[in-house]
UniProtKB/Swiss-Prot annotation:
The gene is infB. It comes from Streptococcus pyogenes serotype M1. This is Translation initiation factor IF-2. Residues 191-207, 282-291 have a biased composition (Polar residues). Residues 488-492 are annotated as: G2. Residues 339-348 have a biased composition (Basic residues).
């Protein structure tokens, strides 16, 4: 049902909004202003009431046509004595809405009660249910008044009415019963009699006229009075709130002024105390300085002045006697006065006639010329160092704008400014980090130039796979270890020392495979000379170029050994030309690199190669100091089951002894035993000597530096500190999610991982294998090295593999019987290898198997929505026609509107006429519903598609 606002009703009937609002309130409607809304029935009621109020009064003589109301058929009989006159029977009206009428009358009666009082309301209620409108008269009302005027009793009239009521309208009869009972009660109580006695007029044949203007004016006056009372109450409340707020502000202001005054008094007291301390300090400094000057003058006085002083003192003795007598009399008087003052009413008073203690003069300390400070020194520490009072320094800092206490730490800049104010040169103290062993390799000032001697050169042999590096080293050592290498590849770095022409040469053998790039780089960092071995029949290969780059980066000279010249296809000139392209130019061509043609297999020109090495070493002037504590580099490290951690070290400076406390990388320990390259125990190792040691608490990393410390306590502290720093650095390197890398992190979450555990015989192989596996590039899959270590595969590795769903890869190691049994029980896979590129190929195949299938979108067809049908509790059904291809039940669909995709989802149903079908072909019509989408519109395009799997190549 629609609603109307009061100002619209006022405009419609030509009245002011104010009058309409007051009239609506009078009718009992809940309105507040001209913007209030009322129901359409209430609006009609307001309009009709205005129209009735505007009609002229109808006199008693005028005949007014009664308003047709829905009443039952009633025959009214007028009685005059014994005479019965029958009036015209009222025609049967239409059915009435009694409930609405009752509600309207109730509202009207409430308004009348408020305006005229309860007595008039009772009179209106006696008008009965049959009056549809109190502003009009009806024939039935006239009859009731006639009955009362003729003196009929109320009981007879009620009985007559009851006999004429039609039994068809039960509700009407009930209302009549209520009216009759109300009339009887009034008659018994004598209310009608009282009304007549009080001179009230009998009700007329028509309803009394209501003066709406008077009632509205009275209501408005009452509202104005109520509003004035409320306004006065609000005004008083506001005045009281303002008064309380003003009091609160005054109290807060007084408290602030009081606090400010206290703060100013404290500040003045502090400044006064500082000034007093400063004046005392100045006076003490002046007195101390004058005392010192007088002392120096007395000491510098010659003997003649001393004699004159002696004579003058003898001449003054006579005058002193008279002064002494006067002083004795004065002292006697003072003593008598003190005696009289001591005794008070028999009380014992302590004797205070003791001599005052002499005041010790404060010593004057000169400021130092230099001040060495550390970050975070306190004011008290600085005052103690420069021999000044902390209060003085606090005051200076206060004048500089720095608020500090004597226990507060100061930064370096503040300390320097303070020293400038005192005129002292400030220097920051350089703290030596005992845990930093890298400083020994960067700064050689700790070496003694008098003890520096010539040392053996460290030579690294580099080259491509199977170009003869190990064969050359085997020939140099007269050993055949090269034949035992799997696949023709050296598995770890070895260090060997030979003697030629009374001089020693240390050789490092680096692997030739690309996987050992980091190991070769580590070898180049400790070497003095590089022997680049190139096969005469193969020429320059990729690993040869890498070896050249590592040697150039290390800044070491290169000696080229062209091997396999005994083969029929050997072409040394081609090798020389190819190396020239990479900056390795022979001395025969005007370059700086020495070229030697050899045959490692047949021991040809090996002596010439060694002589070339010694010649280059002599040119390089390799020196070392064997008297200092030893430092060097870890060549290789491994874990032995019986001996523990074993590290192969190359001593670079100093001499390493057994029982030396040592720090190796992030580990520490004491050298228990030392073994040289021949397997013999030695007690010391000089510079350029490779040895294997035991006694470390953990296995170090290949390439770590080592240093010998003064005692085991210092070594332990340095090792633990380095371990903590390494752990902290590892945590800091952990990538955290930020706005910049958030997308990459989310993308990485979709990548599959292959977890592996690596166990190898030596540390270098572990690092090389882990680096090679991580570099394998398979889109969508990566290798995650869960754990890598040196040693055999044990039960802990199997347990870790089971927990992390990893594969164990053993390189040149075997599992223990217990580990193999546990792996069979827990279904853990163990792969054993001795050739590195076999491991890489196997892991790459496993990574490809981890990939999810790749899908490609295939368009099936298109359809146009011709009509839409909305079904309650079901959704929107789209009637469509296929214009291209087909639409299948299991396909996905896109809803395209104005060339923009607005939804992408699955079909909920597909029908052809009334039948469920699996597909609808081209030029056919059907109906469809889309899951979770009901916003289909005519002319929308439906694109059907499926995702097909693509076979990986």
């Amino acid at each position: 049902m629609s609603k109307k606002r009061l100002h619209e009703i006022a405009k419609e009937i030509g009245k002011s909004s104010k009058e309409v609002v007051e009239h609506a309130k009078y009718l009992g409607l809940d309105v507040k202003s001209h913007a209030s809304s009322v129901e359409e029935a209430d609006a009609k009621k307001i309009i009709s009431s205005f129209s009735k109020a505007s009609k002229p009064d109808v006199t008693a003589s005028q005949t007014v046509k009664p308003k047709e109301v829905a009443q039952p058929s009633v025959t009214v009989v007028k009685e005059t004595g014994s005479e019965h006159v029958e009036k015209t029977q009222v025609s049967k009206p239409k059915s009435r809405n009694f409930k609405a009428e009752r509600e309207a009358r109730a509202k009207e009666q409430a308004a009348r009660k408020q305006a005229n009082g309860s007595s008039h309301r009772s009179q209106e209620r006696r008008g009965g249910y049959r009056q549809p409108n109190n502003h009009q008269t009806n024939e039935q009302g006239d009859k009731r008044i006639t009955h009362r005027s003729q003196g009929d009793t109320n009981d007879k009239r009620i009985e007559r009415k009851a006999s004429n009521v039609s039994p068809r309208h039960d509700n009407h009869q009930l209302v009549g019963d209520r009216n009759r009972s109300f009339a009887k009660e009034n008659h018994k109580n004598g209310r009608f009699t009282n009304q007549k006695k009080q001179g009230r007029q009998e009700p007329q044949s028509k309803s009394p006229k209501i003066d709406f203007k008077a009632r509205a004016a009275a209501l408005k006056a009452e509202q104005n009075a109520e509003y004035s009372r409320q306004s006065e109450t609000r005004f008083r409340a506001q005045q009281e709130a303002k008064r309380l707020a003003e009091l609160a502000r005054q109290e807060a202001k007084e408290a602030a002024l009081k606090a400010q005054a206290e703060e100013m008094s404290h500040r003045e007291a502090a400044l006064k105390s500082i000034e007093e301390a400063e004046t005392k300090l100045k006076s003490s400094n002046i007195s101390a300085k004058s005392t010192a000057d007088n002392r120096r003058k007395k000491q510098a006085r010659p003997e003649k002045n001393r004699e004159l002083t002696h004579h003058s003192q003898e001449g003054q003795k006579k005058n002193k006697k008279s002064w002494n007598s006067q002083n004795q009399v004065r002292n006697q008087k003072n003593s008598n006065w003190n005696k009289n003052k001591k005794t008070k009413k028999g009380k014992n008073v302590k004797n205070t006639n003791t001599a005052p203690k002499p005041v010790t003069e404060r010593k004057f300390h000169e400021l130092p010329k230099e001040f060495e400070y550390t970050e975070g020194m306190t004011v008290a520490e600085i005052a103690k160092r420069i021999k000044r009072e902390p209060a003085e320094i606090v005051k200076k800092l206060f004048m500089m704008g720095v608020m500090a206490t004597q226990n507060q730490s100061l930064d370096g800049d503040t300390i320097e400014l303070l020293m400038v104010d005192y005129g002292i040169e400030a220097k920051a103290k350089v703290e030596v980090d005992d845990a930093d062993i890298e400083r020994f390799f960067e700064d050689e000032n700790y070496l003694n130039p008098e003890n520096i001697v010539e040392r053996a050169p460290v030579v690294t042999i580099m080259g491509h796979v199977d170009h003869g590096k190990t064969t050359l080293l085997d020939t140099l050592r007269n050993s055949r270890v090269a034949t035992g290498e799997a696949g023709g590849i050296t598995q770890h770095i070895g260090a060997y020392q030979i003697e030629e022409a009374g001089k020693k040469i240390t050789f490092l053998d680096t692997p030739g495979h690309a996987a050992f790039t980091s190991m070769r780089a580590r070898g180049a960092s400790v070497t003095d000379i590089t022997i680049l071995i190139v096969a005469a029949d193969d020429g320059v290969m990729p690993q040869t170029i890498e070896a050249i780059n590592h040697s150039k980066a290390a800044g070491v000279p290169i000696i080229v050994a062209i091997n396999k010249i005994d083969k029929p296809g050997a072409n040394p000139e081609r090798v020389i030309a190819e190396l020239a392209e990479y900056g390795i130019i022979s001395t025969a061509w005007g370059g700086e690199c020495e070229f030697v043609e050899i045959s490692a297999k047949f021991n040809k020109n090996i002596d010439e190669l060694l002589e070339t090495v010694l010649l280059v070493a002599e040119v390089e002037e390799l020196k070392a100091d064997p008297t200092v504590r030893a430092i060097g580099t870890v060549i290789e490290a491994r874990l032995d089951k019986g001996k523990g951690a074993i590290a192969t070290l190359l001593v670079q400076q100093g001499t390493l002894h057994v029982q030396d406390p040592i720090v190796v990388g992030n580990t520490f320990g004491r050298v228990r035993a030392m073994v040289n390259d021949l397997g013999r125990r030695v007690k010391s190792a000089e510079p350029s000597t490779p040895v294997s040691i035991t006694g470390l608490n953990e296995t170090p990393m290949a390439g770590d530096h080592f240093a010998v410390y003064a005692d085991e306590k210092a070594a332990r502290a340095a090792g633990e500190e380095r371990s903590k720093r390494a752990l902290l650095k590892q945590r800091q390197n952990t990538q955290r999610v930020s706005l910049d890398n958030l997308f990459d992190t989310l993308k990485a979450g979709e990548i599959k991982t292959v977890n592996v555990i690596i166990k190898a015989d030596v540390q270098g192989s572990v690092e090389a294998l882990a680096a090679s596996l991580v570099k394998i590039e398979v889109e969508g899959v990566r290798v995650n090295v869960v754990h890598s270590a040196v040693g055999a595969i044990n039960e802990s590795d199997v347990t870790l593999a089971e927990a992390s769903n990893a594969v164990i890869i053993g390189f040149n190691v075997r599992p223990t019987p217990q580990a193999r049994q546990q792996a069979d029980t827990d279904d853990v896979e163990i792969r054993l290898h001795s050739i590195i590129y076999k491991v890489i190929e196997e892991v790459e195949e496993a990574m490809k198997g981890k990939l999810d299938p790749v899908y490609q979108e295939k368009i099936l067809g298109e359809a146009i929505i011709r009509e839409t049908f909305k079904v309650s509790k079901v959704g929107t059904i789209g009637g469509f026609m296929v214009i291209n291809g087909k639409v299948t039940r299991d396909s996905s669909v896109r809803v395209i509107r104005d060339s923009v995709v607005i939804f992408d989802g699955k079909l909920a149903s597909l029908k052809h006429y009334k039948d469920d079908v699996k597909e609808v072909g081209n030029a056919q019509e059907g109906g469809l519903m889309i899951e979770n989408f009901n916003d289909l519109k005519v002319d929308d395009t439906i694109e059907a598609y499926i995702m097909e799997e693509i076979v990986r190549k």
